[in-house]
């Protein structure tokens, strides 16, 4: 053998050999199984470039995709940490710490105010990446704060839902957030402001049973799972075979549960048009304070006979 085969060729193979490739360069679509370059997926708002499957986005991505540049995130009120001192296979405080380290969020909701194609809006986005987007006291505080901000700014309130339901580690405290958030949405409506809900995959449990179905306009992303209990639980309880596509956005559209199914690429423009239709030429009632909307109306007194 010559020195070319014994020395030079191995050196060339080493130099041209496979380099270490980061694990996050490619993403496999869960629908069509095609591999997508991560950068292309990010540019396409996490929608598959092959089959148009809408993958789940983070709460911060929702704000970025929806609001114009220059929006402002608001600091949300702090909620009590682990008031029940709950522990299952792991302490609740440890679960919160791990979720915060992983997501860099305080809890399963973020709120910001800004504009959508020039239309003023307050936007809240639930974070499924934070303990499955479960609703506890902190999420309730966030929704109430967002509703109050919308009233004070006389801006529409838009919320992107993504949740597995109430947070079991907070027991009855999490269930209390259902009527609490319902009252918050009513406050927005009494101020004459639009409340728009965008249902994303998945929206289930106590979130579906409360504020998520109370929008003046109900929008869903394609093929989003939307429901209360899971399909298997319903089939086991009713002993009936559910129709194909049950609890998916398109099925709900056909049956009048949602008003429209909108692709992510069209969401900004759609929200802007909806806001314009609901607010142009509308005279809003004068609001001196948020509290004035929540005070119970006292019946008029009649004079004694």
Curated annotation (Swiss-Prot):
Designated gene of the protein: accD
Keywords, in A-Z order: ATP-binding, Cytoplasm, Fatty acid biosynthesis, Fatty acid metabolism, Lipid biosynthesis, Lipid metabolism, Metal-binding, Nucleotide-binding, Transferase, Zinc, Zinc-finger
Residue numbers binding Zn(2+): 29, 32, 48, 51
Catalytic activity: N(6)-carboxybiotinyl-L-lysyl-[protein] + acetyl-CoA = N(6)-biotinyl-L-lysyl-[protein] + malonyl-CoA
Cofactors demanded by this protein: Zn(2+)
Role description: Component of the acetyl coenzyme A carboxylase (ACC) complex. Biotin carboxylase (BC) catalyzes the carboxylation of biotin on its carrier protein (BCCP) and then the CO(2) group is transferred by the transcarboxylase to acetyl-CoA to form malonyl-CoA.
GO biological process, alphabetically ordered: fatty acid biosynthetic process; malonyl-CoA biosynthetic process
Family: Belongs to the AccD/PCCB family.
Subcellular location: Cytoplasm
The protein, known as: Acetyl-coenzyme A carboxylase carboxyl transferase subunit beta
Coiled-coil region: none
Domain of life: Bacteria
Pathway where it operates: Lipid metabolism; malonyl-CoA biosynthesis; malonyl-CoA from acetyl-CoA: step 1/1
Principal location listed in the UniProt entry: cytoplasm
EC number: 2.1.3.15
Gene Ontology molecular functions: acetyl-CoA carboxylase activity; ATP binding; carboxyl- or carbamoyltransferase activity; zinc ion binding
InterPro entries: AcCoA_carboxyl_beta, Acetyl_CoA_COase_Trfase_b_su, ClpP/crotonase-like_dom_sf, COA_CT_N, Znf-ACC
Domain CoA carboxyltransferase N-terminal, chain residue ranges per copy: 25-293
UniProt enzyme class: transferase
Species assigned in the record: Granulibacter bethesdensis (strain ATCC BAA-1260 / CGDNIH1)
CC terms in the record's Gene Ontology section: acetate CoA-transferase complex
ZnF segments: C4-type: 29-51
Gene3D superfamilies reported in the protein's UniProt record: 2-enoyl-CoA Hydratase, Chain A, domain 1
